[in-house]
Design a protein with these regions (language model features):
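Intrinsically disordered, low-complexity, compositionally biased regions/tails
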Residues: 25, 84, 124-127, 158, ...
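Low-complexity, intrinsically disordered short peptide segments enriched in small/polar/basic residues
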Residues: 2, 6, 10, 138-139, ...
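Charged, glycine/proline-rich intrinsically disordered loops and linkers
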Residues: 38-41, 87-93, 166
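N-terminal capping segments
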Residues: 1-72, 182-184
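Extended, compositionally biased low-complexity polar/Lys-Gly-rich tracts
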Residues: 50-61, 106, 139-147, 176-181
């Protein structure tokens, strides 16, 4: 990873920390929802309106100086999880998620949208496990999520997020390396 990319990722992660505690809002089918594709609103406005997992990552992508691409995909909402799957797939940026790989910080983890109940998910690798950075499932991710009574932008371990819903097979399907998504 070049110094410029590493610097961009550090700054983006620093910005992500400022959004911890932002309320999570679930996207509801057929409702207008601003996935924050065109601007980064004030922190107050973001807190007032909340984010879902995709709109949170859209903010991070924009903070990294990238523009959210226009939607050219049928039956996708610009900036949503299905949009990102189709976009990254069309640009050959997806790699199969493998929890034995030590991914670089800033890697995005994606589960594709399936339906209104399983809307997919997207999160960013934030910190390595301090005792052994090769144990990626112990590493921390930042994402907008709901789990039990928690509905916010927060930090969890990748392993907890990966196995809390799909215990046998795991939740995340793809990884998008920073060197790839920074080409947006």
């Amino acid at each position: 990873m070049t110094d410029k990319i590493a610097d961009t990722i550090v700054k983006t992660i620093d910005y992500a920390y400022t959004l911890i505690g932002t309320p999570y809002v679930l996207w509801k089918y057929n409702e207008e929802y601003d996935f924050y594709c065109d601007i980064i609103p004030s922190t107050q406005e973001i807190n007032d309106n909340g984010v879902n997992c995709a709109s949170f990552v859209n903010l991070l992508i924009q903070y990294a100086g990238r523009k959210i691409p226009e939607n050219t995909f049928e039956n996708s909402l610009r900036g949503g999880t299905d949009f990102w799957f189709k976009y990254f797939n069309s640009k050959d940026m997806l790699t199969k998620f493998d929890y034995t790989i030590k991914y670089p910080l800033g890697t995005l983890f994606l589960r594709n949208y399936r339906n209104i109940v399983d809307q997919g998910h997207i999160a960013m690798l934030l910190e390595y496990y301090e005792k052994d950075s090769s144990k990626i499932l112990y590493s921390k991710i930042i994402h907008a999520y709901c789990y039990k009574d928690i509905r916010q932008v927060g930090i969890t371990t990748l392993g907890h997020s990966h196995f809390s819903i799909s215990e046998n097979t795991g939740y995340y399907e793809y990884a998008i390396l920073p060197i790839k998504w920074l080409k947006i």
